[in-house]
A protein has these predicted regions:
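Long, compositionally biased stretches enriched for glycine and/or charged residues
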Residues: 161-301
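Conserved active-site and cofactor/substrate-binding residues in soluble primary-metabolism enzymes
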Residues: 13, 36-39, 97-101, 126, ...
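Rossmann-like NAD(P)(H) cofactor-binding subdomain of soluble oxidoreductases
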Residues: 90-153
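Short, surface-exposed basic-aromatic patches at helix termini and helix-loop junctions that form
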Residues: 23-25, 49-53, 129-139, 157-162
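NAD(P)+-binding Rossmann beta1-loop-alpha1 motif at the extreme N-terminus of oxidoreductases
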Residues: 1-44
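Conserved N-terminal Rossmann-fold NAD(P) cofactor-binding segment
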Residues: 32-72
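NAD(P)H-binding glycine-rich loop region in Rossmannoid oxidoreductase-like domains
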Residues: 58-94
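Structural motif
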Residues: 5, 73-74, 116
Length: 301
């Protein structure tokens, strides 16, 4: 069977859900699952193989090591270290200190990797930057703002009582408390709807807490955001994803247009208020990055 090869690092809630999604839609010819929890990854692979047969998926699923990821066209990093998150604000940043060393260690092992790396591990804007700086990989994207944008469009579609595909709009900045909805450029059927868009912002901010209260951790939404991004980074379809990428001296979410797998920023015009909000998010992320544990080794300049 020919087709792309995708690696998934992490067999927790998001890794499991993503892997099941990859198998069900048969996006890749091979799926390589890597985790430090050997027994867990063996069980997950067996479960996915059963699923693949049941749904007649062409995807071959196997357990692997980090070295096997070099043979993948794309790698999704969904690892999460063991820690207790007691944060009541900036919840996604709660794992920064715990997750940064693990991201750095993986990045060192993947130095020179030439495929696309999609980072899901939170706080994603900080972790994507850490992975890119330590590994030197050129195609690193953080997953988060595209999930925020999907939620935004869904809530606005419900509010306006239209199908979601009639809504156009972006959420940029931090995947977290300082996300910036681009109200001024949001449209329904091509017409501006800034007033109605403003009405759903509170619901957008509350949605992650609603999910956590019900199932403990978001998993399906992030997995869907990864699947959508993989299709574009692998050049299977063209389109736009809001992804965390370099923005000045920080990383944060902006719209990226993919054509044949080639990315190009396509941020909409911003009002003065939206620009100030984006600058505030950048400043906060800049400060937060300085608080991360220093990587033990960086890639040579």
């Amino acid at each position: 069977v020919t087709g792309p090869v995708v690696g998934v690092v992490g067999a927790g809630a998001v890794g499991q859900t993503l892997a099941a999604g990859l198998v069900s839609v048969a996006l890749s010819a091979r799926l390589v699952v890597v985790s430090r929890r050997t027994e867990q990854v063996r069980g997950l692979v067996a479960d996915l193989q059963d699923m693949a047969l049941s749904v007649r998926s062409r995807t071959h699923v196997e357990a692997g090591e980090v070295a096997d990821l070099r043979g993948c066209d794309a790698v999704v990093v969904a690892l999460r270290t063991d820690f207790r998150n007691d944060a009541v604000q900036d919840i996604r940043r709660g794992g920064a200190t715990a997750n940064a060393p693990a991201l750095g260690a993986l990045a060192r092992e993947l130095r020179g990797y030439e495929g696309s790396v999609l980072v899901v591990t939170n706080p994603v804007d900080l972790m994507a930057r850490r992975f890119a700086e330590v590994s030197g990989c050129a195609r690193v994207y953080g997953i988060g703002s595209n999930l925020d944008s999907a939620r935004y469009r869904l809530l606005l579609a419900r509010y306006a009582r239209v199908a979601p595909d009639r809504v156009s709009g972006h959420v940029i900045g931090e995947h977290g408390d300082q996300a910036v909805p681009c109200l001024s450029s949001t449209t329904v059927d091509g017409l501006p709807v800034e007033g109605r868009a403003r009405a759903v912002v509170e619901g957008l901010q509350e949605r992650p807490a609603l999910i956590r209260a019900g199932i403990g951790r978001t998993r399906c939404g992030p997995a869907g955001a990864v699947l959508s991004t993989l299709r574009k980074t692998l050049g299977l379809v063209d389109g736009v994803e809001e992804l965390s990428v370099p923005y000045g001296d920080v990383w944060l979410g902006i719209p990226i247009a993919f054509t044949g797998g080639v990315p190009a920023p396509c941020c909409p015009p911003l009002t003065r208020y939206e620009r100030l909000a984006l600058d505030s998010a950048a400043s906060s992320l800049r400060d937060a990055y300085t608080q991360l544990p220093e990587p033990t080794e960086r890639i040579p300049a």
